[in-house]
């Protein structure tokens, strides 16, 4: 995990703001939709507009085309695609501001554990 001080699961709660770098990607788009469905404020950025980014915008997710430091304003944490390296302006700005940056793989793993816990709680007597 990119940030050992704070665990991602502490951000997977309604009312938090998570910014996704590369939100138009094949694994990031559904992640954004799931997070929004959980009551989390989701914003994101991608290098290019696409059918995926248009769908996210239509569903109420703020999408920025291009990567700029100001895109992360107000975010509690960042989830980045593997294609967004440390020199990405949003990653660099988050680190400079002390905003935790997590890898997409950690986010999907965290959500899988969260979903399993919910299922277990629902099936408990």
Task: Label each region the model flagged.
Residues 1-104:
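N-terminal leader/targeting and accessory segments in enzymes
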């Amino acid at each position: 995990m990119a940030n050992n001080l704070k665990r991602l699961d502490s951000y997977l709660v309604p009312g938090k703001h998570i910014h996704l770098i590369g939100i138009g990607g094949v694994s990031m788009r559904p992640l954004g939709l799931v997070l929004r469905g959980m009551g989390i404020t989701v914003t994101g950025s991608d290098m290019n507009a696409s059918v995926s980014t248009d769908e996210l915008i239509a569903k109420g997710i703020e999408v920025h085309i291009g990567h700029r430091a100001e895109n992360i304003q107000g975010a509690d944490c960042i989830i980045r695609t593997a294609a967004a390296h440390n020199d990405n302006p949003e990653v660099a700005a988050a680190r400079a501001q002390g905003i935790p940056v997590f890898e997409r793989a950690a986010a999907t793993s965290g959500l899988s554990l969260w979903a399993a816990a919910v299922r277990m709680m629902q099936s408990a007597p």
